[in-house]
UniProtKB/Swiss-Prot annotation:
Family the UniProt entry places it in: Belongs to the metallo-beta-lactamase superfamily. RNA-metabolizing metallo-beta-lactamase-like family. INTS11 subfamily.
Gene: CPSF73-II
UniProt-listed InterPro entries: Beta_Casp (IPR022712), INTS11-like_MBL-fold (IPR041897), MBL (IPR050698), Metallo-B-lactamas (IPR001279), RibonucZ/Hydroxyglut_hydro (IPR036866), RMMBL (IPR011108)
Gene null: resulting phenotype: Embryo lethal.
Repressor recorded as keyword: no
Record's subcellular location: Nucleus
Lineage of producing organism: Eukaryota, Viridiplantae, Streptophyta, Embryophyta, Tracheophyta
Quaternary assembly: Component of the CPSF complex, at least composed of CPSF160, CPSF100, CPSF73-I, CPSF73-II, CPSF30, FY and FIPS5. Interacts with CPSF30, CPSF100, CPSF160 and FY.
Protein name according to UniProt: Cleavage and polyadenylation specificity factor subunit 3-II
A GO biological-process term: mRNA processing
Amino acid sequence: MAIDCLVLGAGQEIGKSCVVVTINGKKIMFDCGMHMGCDDHNRYPNFSLISKSGDFDNAISCIIITHFHMDHVGALPYFTEVCGYNGPIYMSYPTKALSPLMLEDYRRVMVDRRGEEELFTTTHIANCMKKVIAIDLKQTIQVDEDLQIRAYYAGHVLGAVMVYAKMGDAAIVYTGDYNMTTDRHLGAAKIDRLQLDLLISESTYATTIRGSKYPREREFLQAVHKCVAGGGKALIPSFALGRAQELCMLLDDYWERMNIKVPIYFSSGLTIQANMYYKMLISWTSQNVKEKHNTHNPFDFKNVKDFDRSLIHAPGPCVLFATPGMLCAGFSLEVFKHWAPSPLNLVALPGYSVAGTVGHKLMAGKPTTVDLYNGTKVDVRCKVHQVAFSPHTDAKGIMDLTKFLSPKNVVLVHGEKPSMMILKEKITSELDIPCFVPANGETVSFASTTYIKANASDMFLKSCSNPNFKFSNSTQLRVTDHRTADGVLVIEKSKKAKIVHQDEISEVLHEKNHVVSLAHCCPVKVKGESEDDDVDLIKQLSAKILKTVSGAQIHESENCLQVASFKGSLCLKDKCMHRSSSSSSEAVFLCCNWSIADLELGWEIINAIKLNH
């Protein structure tokens, strides 16, 4: 069974995540995002690579969205309402609840405020979300007769999932964005040990290994505190869901401990709704937040207030969380234009910014001016501080997950090409797993392993207790355990399979036992050579056998002998069917037969007793 992985977005870049995997002719789309740093046709994935005719319903079996970030869900309303896809769409309950907020906020910023072309409307968003089927963690969904999917906790943001998809014997995992460590409000990614043909993993921080979070938190708090203590304003661009809550919890706690009276603001609107959903979806948060929730709501911040636009020009220090996080548009960019020219102020960038955004330009080096989308230039005299509070896993986390799942192949997406190539070599050399880094529009093909599921008979299982059955010395079951046992695999016409003991074959097949034997009439003495009787001759032959076959257990009678299944008796026939036609008629013959199980023993005895030996 073949597996084809077509990368429509996030191939050797970060943005517009969209991967289409074909298993035995059926296509699954993982994520349907937009590129936050593009404002042309490159904003969306090239959907024509799926179907040139535009018949997406027949081309795609289902779409699975891993989380609500725009680079993973931003193109979905366009694909369903403009391109016409009407098939099943799956996402977690939090993602279904929060995606409409993110999509509408983006539409409002880009169209209502910036006057860009409207690629999807508010109605499109609403109609798109009506088609979404919400799923629980570890709930196995039977998409159709052959395809099943299951979601696993990914950390990263509220409701983010990794997706396991299985069709027949082929199985894959698409990680989406994930975090292998806990933070203040979310837990670490959790997934079962699975047999996989393919792992498709994000690689945002393909070469970064982060140390303890506490020095980073301290550095961030000191930078913000120093700014406001000097009378400046600190702008923290962040997405309304995820990093904003993480940093609000951090600052709110620090403000309490340090008794700081400088106001902390949240840009009004979307973040208020986001905090409401966090309170409703507390079960998706970290264990620490769940425990705190028993006594108080950890998202009811004591020192955080709503921000009014009139406060942009208000005197005095303050801290402001404003969306979006990459300074690509919206309120955060508007505030940046006003605050960037002052050397007292600070822009604290807590996460990754894609190429083409103002955030990325600031991270690349401290510029003196920044060009905005409409040709406006902004003088940058403020301090710029970058601290890695990213909810993405680092290189160690990617390696740990890959080693844990031990897939047959790995495809890396959602990263920067130079770093991805380094990680690719690391996975190949250290884990001995083939790894691929396709660009957008490229397809990588794999062959999946065919497995046969078989029941085992009682007799076969009992036979496994013999010394030939090798159990692992490990106290835990491992996929790599080497276990061997002799049995016969029987596959019926119905394709049901069973492993049975060899002694059960005739019963299972409703056939009689057949025994394969060998026979040979062997010359052992020349007639008249001596006057020995039959008994003496048998004794002489037994002595020859003992010289050749050490320790042989020989049973003798008047005119025959037996060793294991080998039986030999003096032949009185003038012509015997087991005798060679070239044999001398002047010889005495021993007519022998033995089981094929004693093939080597039989011929060893023949060579020992035959005439002229």
